[in-house]
Design a protein with these regions (language model features):
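ABC family nucleotide-binding domain
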Residues: 21-227, 232-235
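Short beta-strand in the C-terminal region of the ABC ATPase nucleotide-binding domain
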Residues: 234, 239-242
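ABC-family P-loop ATPase nucleotide-binding domain
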Residues: 1-31, 243-260, 265, 269-283
Length: 283
């Protein structure tokens, strides 16, 4: 499962061979206004290749707006957003649509699966929309479902899947086009505790093989387990930013409560397997 970096086809797109630590996401003084409401206020942020960054804050702080900006679902009122060498503000609507399909993968809180399609077709459709043949798309979709431990549910419709199974299908869909950046919007918010922990393990494994992650969450446990850096927002701005890689020594979670002793970037490092299956390492 190699994170792959294809541009959306715009002129001057970067070479797909990134080096570790290269800036993948750069927001420079980004503001967003909705009428009289200022959702983002001159916010600047960088995310490097291979990082897992969690964004937290109270409702209305701007974290969902931030995610939508990076996902190409909305445009800023001011400032620039650069993702994998592309200035999103310079893309046409067609270019933005291609960017959303190829360069970023999105994991939704409530899964956003198509009810009338079985799991395999839900995943395969993501690649077919970028021009991949149905046969090739279904083959890769099956490989992903197998790696995520739900291949035996490939012919099941979403309504017959558990919440954890639906989220795994959603993760497979997000990974289908080998995105440079994986975005997660409250990925465990609709799950029970056990399923939520399994999805956290999955995010940790993906990050350990090189996948860049941006996670928006209210959950300090998710943030401290899955991220190496925490961005706390308030009133459309970054109020605090800190590394979580020393949190075993810090002993506090983002909300100031005692931590559970989680190790940096999750549990025991295992960069070669996901769900007990071998994975390709990022190039």
């Amino acid at each position: 499962m190699t994170p792959h970096h294809e541009s959306a086809g715009s002129a001057g797109s970067p070479d797909s061979a990134d080096s570790p630590g290269q800036v993948v996401v750069r927001l420079d003084r980004v503001s967003k206004e909705y009428g009289d409401t200022l959702a983002l206020d001159a916010l600047s942020l960088e995310i490097r290749r291979g990082e897992a960054v969690a964004v937290m804050g109270p409702s209305g702080c701007g974290k969902s707006t931030l995610l939508n900006m990076v996902a190409g679902l909305d445009r800023p009122s001011a400032g620039t957003i650069d993702v994998h060498g592309q200035d999103l503000g310079g893309l046409t609507e067609t270019g933005l649509a291609l960017y959303r399909r190829r360069d970023v993968g999105m994991i939704f809180q409530f899964f956003n699966l198509i009810d009338d399609l079985p799991a395999l077709d839900n995943v395969a459709l993501a690649a077919q929309l970028t021009g991949t043949s149905a046969r090739q798309a279904r083959r890769r979709a099956l490989e992903l479902l197998d790696e995520l431990g739900v291949a035996d549910r490939r012919n099941n419709y979403p309504a017959t899947l558990s919440g954890g199974e639906r989220q795994r299908v959603g993760v497979a869909r997000a990974l289908m086009n080998r995105p440079a950046l994986l975005l997660a919007d409250e990925p465990t918010g609709a799950l029970d505790s056990r399923s939520g922990e399994q999805v956290m393990d999955l995010l940790i494994d993906l990050n350990q093989i090189g996948q860049t992650l941006l996670i928006v969450t209210h959950d300090p446990h998710l943030a401290t387990r899955c991220a190496g850096r925490l961005v706390e927002m308030a009133d459309g701005r970054i109020a605090r930013e800190r590394s979580l890689n020393d949190r075993a020594l810090d002993s506090e979670t983002p909300d100031g409560t005692a931590s559970d002793g989680a190790t940096p970037n999750g549990a025991t490092p295992n960069s070669e397997t996901l769900n007990g299956k071998p994975l390709e390492r990022s190039a």
